[in-house]
């Protein structure tokens, strides 16, 4: 029975195979038929196109014939006969003499060569007639259609030509002219004639056919014989095909049997394959379930959930018919719930950890930002500009500033000893009364961290914060469809932590730690948003940050009020700037903090100006007020070259050489004079003076100004550099630095003015005036520097293009000019005071000596000349006008003092010896005046004035020493020797005091005669009045 079933199945399978084979063969046949149809259509289409082309050619030929017909000529009999012969010869040659009509004429009555069939034999029967019915030329022209290209062209065939044998047949063969031809026949009732013509044409063709058949009869019989032989062979071939078909049927039955067997075996193979797949799926599902249990035990919940989803969505669905699979599928939600509880516990621990480490995270974030800012500042071209390319430590050395403890460029940002160790730092409390300088401003960042290569790192990795518990919770809650519930849970707990972060503790809190905790909190939120979007709402985080920003700003403003000098303010600003940049790096809105930082500039400038003025006051008090002596190359570079004072000194030395005509004043030690000889001065102007060997050869060297001048340059440069460092990343710095620099120089000018006013030493005041000249040049130096800094590097090249309104203007320069003028006036005033002090000692000189004295000048006049001799070299660096004014007023004061001595009312009497002593003093000062007046630097006016101040004194002294004083009244003698003595009452007063003491009987005749001459002179002078 089973064998029978198998056979039946095999037969069924074989039948199905045969059916499939037949269907496949049928499909192939259908495809081949479709392909043949398509090919046939293509060929028909191509043939139709060829027919159209041939018709077009025929039309062209007909048009040519029509044009020939319109000429009205008819071929002669001879031509007709030759045409018939041509037709016969063509018909015989077309197919080897055995063709029929179809071989020589196509369906349109044309020959195979494309020309119209000739009917000359028909014309021969009808003679030379033009047609059966002839029409007028006008009717013929109206019966045919016009050409579309030329409206005035004549018809192709006229009606008179239609009924000629040849023309009518041509018209009938052309379908385009058939209609008009037939119409004309019926209109003219010529049907019978037309029929006769056609019959004649048909008869002629029959004769032609018979003739052709007669000529090719033998060939036709041979062809029929060959065809009958071919028919017999066809029958044999048909029988062979029938036999072959039978054999194929037999072979096919065997193949069908084998096919049925193969089909049965294939079913068995498929059953085994399906069974194997089911077993493999069961095995994999069991192994995957075991893997899930293993992951759960290892706390790899993420992998466990993924495998459970794969198990549920893929494998268990395929095994839904098995009980164990249904049990496993039922336990998957239970296991997920268990995993949810476990991961939530881990998540809660993670929340506690990030709360405890928020300050550490914030601090590491600030360290990352500080390193980036430090690197940017090192490569920032503005830093090189603002530091003038110099070492800032050298500035402190020049200004005698002790090293600052907090030298860190990133503020009070110290690394914790260990990330998990507690931080001990001063406590911030609004009522603690501590200034920001005690809030940890002096803490430094680890130098190793600053010097190492600044690489971007993750603060979360450094603080050992992993976000795996959060991501795990997110995935698991999303897989069980409770993501929104977890979002609400996370948001609630983080908001509770946020409230704790922004509220300072009751016992107080380190303000840096307070900011770092806030920063750490929002860094975590930013990381969560970026890595889990759209898990958290950015709106919620931004609202939290806005509330924290209000609190932070309030705390910072309160701390800002406690800053009392620049150092804590700088450290405070740097810390806030790092905090702000870190928050900005994590995409939080920090514009209010930048506004707050901008408000610090005003206070910083106040503190910085105050400290700079105090530092300058110390410099001024410590200054030696002597010419600066440079002994080392290092000093020359840091004090002279760095401030371009060598250029200014060179210009002043050139001016000095021109004014002194190569007679330079060298002041200072004698050794300096030996070192600074003429050869050295010539070297000073060499083009290669900046080379170290050239400079070293000129050292030690003396400069006109004191050390205060390079210290002033350094102080201003340090002020500008520190301001730009403080205002890093702030806005509108240009106006602040211009205004602050101008204010600082004004304050320094006030210090100088006050110091000048209090100074009493003439050399000190002179040195200050010289220094002031260099300070004025320094203002120009810093003005050009600020212009290049603000207007760009090309300012020096394109100064003419820059608008005057855009240039930096330092009004303090005018104040320095005023102070310098004040100093110059003070020099003259102090000199006058000194001369008066020295001349005041002449009040005690003896005007009525009893004994003769020598001709030496007295001490007071020697001291005055010595003072002038010592002071004049100090005056030499000053301007020529000031020097002229100084020496002119000095000698004028001396002459006035001498006048006051001799005209003093307290002078009761004087004698000849007293006048001779005064004459010795006057000669000494006159000699000194002439010496100075003859110096080459003196102008003619100055020299004349210097000598002129003592001419009246000389005339008065000569008059008192004259043996004939009564000659004074002689106009000629007076005009020649006493023309400047115009105050007669004073002269009479002196003459009344001028007499020799009478000794009674022992008085000498000489004395008596002199007293008598004086009395006579007094009388004559009075009489002359």
Curated annotation (Swiss-Prot):
It is found in: Cytoplasm; Cytoplasm, Perinuclear region; Midbody, Midbody ring. Residues 1-10, 22-52 have a biased composition (Basic and acidic residues). Keywords: Coiled coil, Cytoplasm, Exocytosis, Protein transport, Transport. GO terms for molecular function: small GTPase binding. It comes from the Eukaryota. The exocyst complex is composed of sec3/exoc1, sec5/exoc2, sec6/exoc3, sec8/exoc4, sec10/exoc5, sec15/exoc6, exo70/exoc7 and exo84/exoc8. This is Exocyst complex component 6. The lineage of its organism: Eukaryota, Amoebozoa, Evosea, Eumycetozoa, Dictyostelia. The gene is exoc6.
């Amino acid at each position: 029975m089973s064998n029978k079933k198998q056979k039946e199945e095999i037969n069924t399978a074989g039948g199905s195979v045969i059916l499939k084979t037949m269907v496949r063969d049928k499909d192939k046949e259908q495809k081949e038929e479709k392909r043949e149809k398509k090919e046939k259509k293509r060929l028909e289409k191509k043939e139709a196109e060829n027919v159209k082309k041939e018709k077009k050619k025929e039309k062209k030929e007909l048009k040519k014939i029509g044009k020939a017909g319109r000429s009205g000529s008819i071929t002669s009999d001879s031509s007709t006969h030759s045409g018939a012969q041509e037709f016969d010869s063509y018909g015989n040659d077309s197919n080897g003499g055995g063709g029929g009509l179809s071989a020589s004429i196509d369906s349109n009555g044309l020959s195979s060569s494309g020309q119209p069939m000739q009917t000359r034999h028909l014309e021969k029967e009808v003679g030379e007639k033009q047609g059966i019915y002839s029409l007028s030329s006008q009717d013929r022209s109206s019966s045919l259609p016009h050409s579309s290209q030329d409206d005035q062209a004549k018809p192709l065939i006229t009606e008179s030509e239609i009924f000629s044998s040849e023309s009518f047949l041509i018209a009938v063969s052309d379908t385009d002219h058939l209609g008009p031809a037939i119409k004309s026949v019926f209109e003219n009732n010529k049907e019978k004639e037309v029929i006769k013509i056609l019959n004649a044409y048909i008869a002629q063709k029959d004769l032609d056919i018979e003739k052709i058949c007669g000529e090719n009869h033998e060939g036709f019989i041979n062809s029929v014989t060959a065809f009958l032989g071919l028919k017999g062979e066809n029958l044999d071939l048909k029988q062979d095909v029938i036999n072959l078909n039978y054999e194929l049927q037999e072979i096919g039955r065997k193949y069908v049997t084998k096919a049925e067997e193969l089909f049965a075996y294939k079913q068995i193979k498929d059953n085994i394959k399906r069974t194997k797949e089911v077993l493999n799926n069961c095995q994999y599902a069991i192994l995957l379930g075991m893997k899930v249990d293993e992951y759960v035990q290892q706390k790899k919940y993420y992998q466990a959930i993924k495998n459970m989803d794969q198990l549920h969505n893929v494998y268990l669905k395929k095994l839904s018919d098995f009980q164990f699979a249904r049990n496993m599928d039922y336990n998957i939600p239970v296991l997920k719930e268990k995993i949810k509880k476990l991961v939530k516990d881990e998540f809660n621990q993670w929340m506690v950890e990030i709360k405890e480490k928020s300050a550490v995270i914030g601090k590491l974030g600030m360290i990352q930002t500080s390193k980036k800012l430090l690197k940017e500042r090192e490569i920032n071209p503005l830093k090189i500009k603002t530091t003038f390319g110099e070492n800032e430590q050298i500035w402190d050395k020049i200004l005698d500033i002790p090293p600052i403890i907090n030298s860190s460029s990133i503020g009070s940002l110290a690394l914790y000893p260990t990330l998990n160790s507690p931080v001990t730092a001063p406590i911030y409390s609004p009522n603690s009364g501590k200034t920001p300088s005690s809030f940890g401003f002096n803490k430094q960042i680890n130098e190793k961290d600053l010097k190492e290569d600044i690489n971007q790192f993750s603060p979360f990795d450094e603080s050992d914060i992993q976000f795996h518990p959060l991501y795990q919770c997110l995935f698991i809650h999303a897989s069980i469809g409770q993501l929104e519930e977890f979002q609400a849970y996370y948001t609630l707990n983080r908001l509770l932590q946020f409230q704790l972060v922004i509220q300072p503790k009751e016992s107080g809190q380190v303000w840096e730690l307070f900011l770092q905790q806030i920063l750490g909190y929002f860094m975590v939120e930013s990381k969560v948003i970026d890595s889990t979007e759209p898990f958290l709402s950015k709106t919620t985080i931004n609202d939290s940050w806005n509330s924290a920003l209000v609190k932070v700003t309030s705390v910072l403003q309160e701390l800002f009020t406690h800053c009392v000098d620049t150092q804590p303010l700088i450290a405070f600003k740097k810390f806030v700037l790092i905090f702000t940049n870190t928050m900005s790096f994590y995409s939080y809105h920090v514009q209010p903090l930048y506004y707050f930082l901008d408000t610090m500039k005003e206070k910083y400038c106040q503190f910085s100006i105050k400290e700079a003025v105090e530092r300058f006051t110390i410099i001024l008090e410590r200054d030696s007020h002597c010419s600066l002596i440079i002994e080392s190359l290092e000093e020359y570079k840091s004090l002279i070259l760095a401030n371009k004072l060598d250029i200014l000194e060179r210009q002043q030395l050139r001016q000095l050489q021109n004014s002194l005509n190569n007679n330079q004043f060298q002041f200072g030690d004698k050794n300096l004079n030996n070192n600074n000889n003429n050869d050295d001065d010539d070297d000073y102007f060499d083009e290669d003076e900046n080379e170290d060997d050239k400079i070293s050869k000129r050292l030690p060297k003396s400069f006109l100004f004191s050390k205060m001048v390079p210290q002033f340059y350094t102080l201003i440069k340090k002020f500008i550099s520190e301001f730009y460092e403080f205002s890093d990343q702030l806005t509108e710095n240009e106006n602040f630095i211009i205004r602050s620099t101008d204010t600082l120089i004004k304050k320094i000018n006030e210090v100088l003015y006050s110091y000048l006013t209090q100074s009493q030493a003439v050399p000190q005041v002179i040195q200050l005036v010289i220094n002031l000249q260099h300070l004025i040049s320094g203002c120009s130096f810093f003005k050009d520097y600020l212009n290049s800094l603000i207007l760009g590097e090309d300012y020096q090249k394109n100064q003419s293009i820059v608008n005057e309104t855009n240039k930096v203007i330092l009004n303090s320069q005018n104040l320095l000019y005023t102070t310098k003028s004040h100093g110059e006036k003070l020099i003259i005033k102090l000199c006058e005071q000194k001369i008066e002090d020295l001349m005041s000692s002449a009040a005690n000189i003896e005007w009525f000596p009893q004994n003769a004295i020598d001709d030496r000048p007295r001490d007071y006049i020697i001291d005055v000349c010595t003072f002038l001799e010592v002071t004049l070299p100090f005056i030499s660096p000053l301007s020529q006008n000031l020097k002229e004014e100084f020496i002119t007023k000095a000698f004028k004061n001396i002459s006035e003092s001498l006048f006051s001595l001799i005209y003093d009312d307290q002078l009761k009497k004087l004698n000849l010896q007293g006048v001779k002593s005064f004459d010795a003093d006057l000669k000494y000062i006159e000699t000194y005046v002439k010496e100075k007046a003859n110096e080459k630097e003196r102008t003619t006016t100055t020299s004349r004035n210097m000598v002129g101040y003592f001419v009246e004194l000389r005339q008065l002294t000569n008059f008192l020493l004259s043996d004939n004083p009564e000659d004074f009244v002689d106009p000629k003698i007076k005009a020649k020797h006493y023309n400047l003595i115009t105050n007669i009452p004073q002269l009479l007063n002196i003459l009344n005091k001028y007499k020799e003491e009478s000794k009674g009987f022992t008085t000498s005749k000489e004395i008596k005669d002199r007293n008598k001459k004086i009395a006579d002179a007094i009388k004559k002078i009075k009489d002359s009045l």
